[in-house]
């Protein structure tokens, strides 16, 4: 199926919301899947969490400072085992909802949000890129100024102290979120979506890497390297 052909996908959007660059190292029967890859709805994993988080913050059901006990990082939700990436090392224990986002704790997010909403993770890459672009340019049609600021601060903290730390750069401030998906066949997919400012222009970038070959599959390191290359290219 389509799931096996993705290797690496990159999309770059400018301040106006135009996609100015995309590349996909995906070939199926020798044909490039360019546009289909970007518009096909699929499991975007934890990259999609902020989309579900915003309405819950807006309603005041939760706040980012709420605490949640994720225990050892293994949680049974509706008969399905949810595992945090550090479950083998004992989990995060008690953390805030904001930290659950910073550290990409699926258990923390599900325990915090599932009483109020169903966390939807199936979107096309283009939809996810558009969402992060809305945050990048402070599009208040998606939420109040207060929530917008909270999400932007959280995305900045992902890079300064969370799973996006490998993206930290002294020259260009990058903000966003790392993502991960474990497919049904056990294969991994890691990603980063975020934004940065170069020469007074705001760019939004999505990187997805499938079946990462080297080392522990981390969106911060693997997808982050690609984002840094793009930043350096634009910041020449």
Language model regions located:
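Short, glycine/proline-biased beta-turn/loop segments that scaffold the active-site neighborhood
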Residues: 23, 42-97, 103-105
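Flexible glycine/proline-enriched surface loops and loop-helix/loop-strand junctions
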Residues: 32-39, 81-82, 90-95, 102-109, ...
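Active-site SXXK
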Residues: 17, 40-68, 100, 115, ...
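Surface-exposed patches in mature extracellular/periplasmic domains of secreted proteins
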Residues: 7-13, 65-67, 111-113, 139, ...
